[in-house]
UniProtKB/Swiss-Prot annotation:
Residues 198-212 have a biased composition (Pro residues). Belongs to the SOWAH family. This is Ankyrin repeat domain-containing protein SOWAHA. Residues 136-153 have a biased composition (Polar residues).
Amino acid sequence: MALAAAAAAAAAAAGVSQAAVLGFLREHGGQVRNSELLSRFKPLLDAGDPRGRAARRDRFKQFVNNVAVVKELDGVKFVVLRKKPRPPEGPEAPLPSSPGVPAALAQCAAVPAEDNCAPGAPHSPQRSGEPPEDSSAPSELQHTPETLPSEVTQVEAPSGSAPQPGGPEDPALPRSSELARPASVPSGLALTSTESPGPEPAPPTAQVPPQKPCMLPVRCVVPGPAALRIRAEEQGLRRQRSEEPSPRGSPMLLRRLSVEESGLGLHLGPGRSPHLRRLSRAGPRLLSPDTEEMPVAPLPSPAVPLEPTEHEWLVRTASGRWSHQLHGLLLRDRGLAAKRDFMSGFTALHWAAKNGDREMALQLVEVARRGGAPVDVNARSHGGYTPLHLAALHGHEDAAVLLVVRLGAQVHVRDYSGRRAYQYLRPGSSYALRRLLGDPGLRSMMEPDAASGGSGSLVSRHPVQVAATILSSTTSAFLGVLADDLMLQDLARGLKKSSSFSKFLGASPMAPRKKTKIRGGLPSFTEISHRSTPGPLAGLVPSLPPPT
């Protein structure tokens, strides 16, 4: 185990070099996503002694800044090679790979811009923020990448056919896809490089010679078929997400697909997405599940801040008042209408209903629907409250009517305590609102009050009883008018006396009867009642009993 740990540390120290970074960029056409670069070199940065991790990360940042720049294209960060004029082709200085060259000179040749090319010379590392000088940058772009394929070819040779000194070399260099294929590397060469036969052979006990700086231990790992399938699916998912256009250019949906630098501790750019932080921490385990990882202390999870647009939206919507600033933010990003407050779970529609702002509620739904991002009118907060619950709770009847009639809110939705919106109405709320929200207590309002002894209204009584009451009152009034022939005489005279009209209105069948003076021309009503009525009127006029 100690020998394997030492080999892993040596591979990590040799693999993270400026030549390796430059070769990786050249293999991908001089431009690669920041996420791919970080996911490729993160196992090298985490391997080895945990105490030297910070130094390895600083060196890696310096290597990246020496040969490339970070650019953001269409919301995705790319690492692009520096544009330097190339001098005419001449004899290039390959990395020393012949027998007899010490490892110190090989490592010095791999990083010409960083160290002096003399054994034992003092190192003069550059700061990560300073760009490399003009004299050193072109030489790095020329000398370092050309020797990378040949050395990787030596590593990928089969275990049974090790390269012999002086033997013929294959003139055809392998392609980048073949170089990146880890299945061709045998298990015996996973952590060791080919021994270079020197004039002084190594003793039999030392079986692990120092690796060359351009070798990438990521390619030497032999993962199983499951790991290769997971890796292919992950790369396809990243490519699909990067090529997928977002609707209406929403900045909320344009999430960065790069692995966040803050999760790796590299600080090449500001962190944005917590989901990608988790992917960056789980990336090495997905790519190399068969390798043994050194036990390291878990890094504290950094707090993920909100984007400036989201933060401004949450602060302004909490006031519950519609403004031009809110309208502008919503026009730029329709997805903000569904953004929830992380403390209460309120959306902007919840705040509008709580404060009774009908214009804000209407504009939120209309603008979001026109932009292709419909708003859920029945969205629940952390307590299960819908906007209709909040409007009823705070006594905003107009907002509640707008939510139900115009926006289509459901009145039967219950919160997490099992209550519907009508149960939060204040005492004295209007009858129309209670009926709109489906209050079942309105049925008992029409029932007769048994405690007061009332007979109830006409609506609550039986229809037969209502018809009998109306018929009895109409018949009594009609018979009262016919029973008093004095009233008929006053009406015949044209209602000359005002008292006659008052007597007519106050007539009732129970009033005392007066003796009338019988005139010769007209028979009285009493005579008519005692006669037998022939013809079609027989049986229509009631007969009165004879006077006693």
